[in-house]
């Protein structure tokens, strides 16, 4: 009996010890600490109401999350004094928000700026209190450096490795300037001289002596962080340059149309440089101009809907994905050329002018029209899209996908099942069409797509406009979307349930017969 009592006592002691250990090592914030715990419902509103937030996405069972917790609690207490909240999201209990934030490892720390929930920056520094607090304080307080005199500016210019932006006395711009500085603190240095009588906004590039002044209406920037950001990103780019890989992302992030000149030799590049530099200067802030070596980047022209015939000039609007180019030769004629055919300079200038005026005609890419449809998911191509989606009698559901997109691949079998279910019911077969289009192989000018897969429903009727599906891509939600948004209000879920009840009944009958045998 004594042994039993000791044994039980040991077990109880062990359990108590284990409980205290687990409590000590819990990844969740200690009640009463400055480390806040958020849920999916509160996440969006919290981020949108704070200019700077550090968020930990964690899993309760994760040892690394448990180790990080005390460091975050200390950091939260320090950062609270600087009005920078530190919060937690438990990914086990809030899986949807973690999925939306593409959280793949635990713990993941993300920095959210200016209330944007889908633009979080992953913190890649050391995950200890001092490093975290130092980084966040510097990000918040040093995003704009306030100076008292012109003499204090010079050291920043002499030692600059990043573009230096200077706000001289434009106090009305302060709030917008601070917001943009917070966003771009890792790419620019922002200085502010509040008492200056100069009243100007300028940017100094490293290793240059002449500043670039903002020569527009400053009032157009006040309260308009997008416009200020756009100016900063565009003005640092040359009028025309032979592109380097590390510079290309800056052109992409400017969101301006990109004009490409593919050259075949250094002599050819030199011959056209003055023309394109002048065009770049005349169209600053409207079109960016770059050169590409056709030997190094021959296949890039495929993304411009053009053939590999060099030299070549084309314009790509990356917002709506429309492409414009000079006329090209038939393949047979191009193959007979003994040397590159020069581009017509007047035609280059005219294409740029027509593009700016909105009269240039885009190059439309389309697969060939299928001779037969091989499944219940109807294949649409660029040439047939508009005729098919605007149907007097049918609701038309269209999936715009990309072959390289993992989300498109995951959704494909679900979409196929939706089509099969609706095709199984004769009463709705003529009232709805389930279709898809490969956006990488077909240009749809009437409906530019920027994310994949995009699901849109065109209700029956000639003048119907697409209704975008924005819920979880599963069977139930898509059926509900069709029912609520379509002209015919087809209840796909009811058809699905009826179909599976019939199958279950067949299986039950077969089992009964088998048992009787």
UniProtKB/Swiss-Prot annotation:
Keyword annotations of the record: Endoplasmic reticulum, Glycoprotein, Isomerase, Redox-active center, Repeat, Signal
InterPro entries for this protein: Prot_disulphide_isomerase, Thioredoxin-like_sf, Thioredoxin_domain
Reactions mediated catalytically: Catalyzes the rearrangement of -S-S- bonds in proteins
All copies of domain Thioredoxin, residue ranges: 30-141, 355-487
Intervals of motif Prevents secretion from ER: 514-517
Cleaved signal peptide residues: 1-29
Enzyme class: isomerase
CDD domains documented for this protein: PDI_a_family (cd02961), PDI_a_PDI_a'_C (cd02995), PDI_b'_family (cd02982), PDI_b_family (cd02981)
Glycosylation sites: 159, 174, 207, 293, 462
Highest taxon listed in the record's lineage: Eukaryota
Post-translational modification: May have O-linked mannose residues.
Its EC number(s): 5.3.4.1
GO BP of this protein: protein folding; response to endoplasmic reticulum stress
Cellular component per GO, a single term: endoplasmic reticulum lumen
Role of this protein: Probably interacts with nascent polypeptides in the endoplasmic reticulum. It is an essential gene only in the absence of PDI. Its native disulfide isomerase activity is very low.
Name of this protein: Protein disulfide-isomerase EUG1
The organism of origin for this protein: Saccharomyces cerevisiae (strain ATCC 204508 / S288c)
Gene that specifies this protein: EUG1
